[in-house]
Amino acid sequence: MKTLIRKFSRTAITVVLVILAFIAIFNAWVYYTESPWTRDARFSADVVAIAPDVSGLITQVNVHDNQLVKKGQILFTIDQPRYQKALEEAQADVAYYQVLAQEKRQEAGRRNRLGVQAMSREEIDQANNVLQTVLHQLAKAQATRDLAKLDLERTVIRAPADGWVTNLNVYTGEFITRGSTAVALVKQNSFYVLAYMEETKLEGVRPGYRAEITPLGSNKVLKGTVDSVAAGVTNASSTRDDKGMATIDSDLEWVRLAQRVPVRIRLDNQQENIWPAGTTATVVVTGKQDRDESQDSFFRKMAHRLREFG
């Protein structure tokens, strides 16, 4: 009898342990797959692609790669002597047409005062037409001078905002063309996180919800707020034919992979460039309030740690 009871007890304990293990694994799976979190998140920032508005030789580079610069600080300079000469030439043209316009104005005024009693109407009209032509040439010369002045000012390339110079690829003596990107500027205090959430987890993601960000390789947890959720993503299976009609790919996979939707998260505290733009992180959306770690069960703490390993 005792042997039977002992065997029954062992069987019951085994069944209970199996059931508990199954429940734990099931809860872990649900928590892992349905809670709003992702390992596919990246730090991002506002980046300004700096390109000159004039072409010429680079005569001076005032910064080095990865340097923190202030708004208005000179980054590099382009061939100022050439543009200075162009401005002087334009100023000389303006001075010439100003004198010429004054002469033609006096001549036209004299002929208009004398009238048709002293000369023909054709001569009077000709003087007025010459004056108008010279005035137009003067206006054109003034516009050319203003453009030359603007070009001279733009030979000095300045930082449009506070930030870090990155990917600097200009050197003294190189020729740079107008519009070609010379350097990228990562704006200071503009860092945020883009979390690519699976569509199955968007139910728990709303603007204003709190989020935890753990940079890859770090135990530090940053706090943030969901700023916005992307309004749409590209549909790779839909295209257009030459008449504009929609063409849908007929392939339907047995296992459908969830689309990933970008979620923008605003950081509570800017971290400067400790985690550069493009580096990865794990993001957990905790809901309307921050997670109270002191009330987390051992299971939840383990689940949070397991997220770091995928």
Curated annotation (Swiss-Prot):
Q: Where is coiled-coil annotated?
A: none
The record's InterPro entries line, in alphabetical order, gives: CusB-like_dom_1 (IPR043602), CusB_D23 (IPR032317), MFP_Efflux_Pump (IPR050393), PHBA_efflux_pump_AaeA (IPR022871), RND_pump_MFP (IPR006143)
SUPFAM superfamilies with a match to the protein in the record? HlyD-like secretion proteins
Keywords, sorted A to Z = Cell inner membrane, Cell membrane, Membrane, Transmembrane, Transmembrane helix, Transport
Q: Which residues cross the membrane?
A: 12-32
- Single annotated GO MF: transmembrane transporter activity
Places the protein is found: Cell inner membrane
Where mainly found?
A: membrane
Q: What does this protein do?
A: Forms an efflux pump with AaeB.
HAMAP family per the UniProt record, alphabetical = AaeA
Protein family membership: Belongs to the membrane fusion protein (MFP) (TC 8.A.1) family.
Quote the protein name from its UniProt record.
p-hydroxybenzoic acid efflux pump subunit AaeA
- Gene field: aaeA
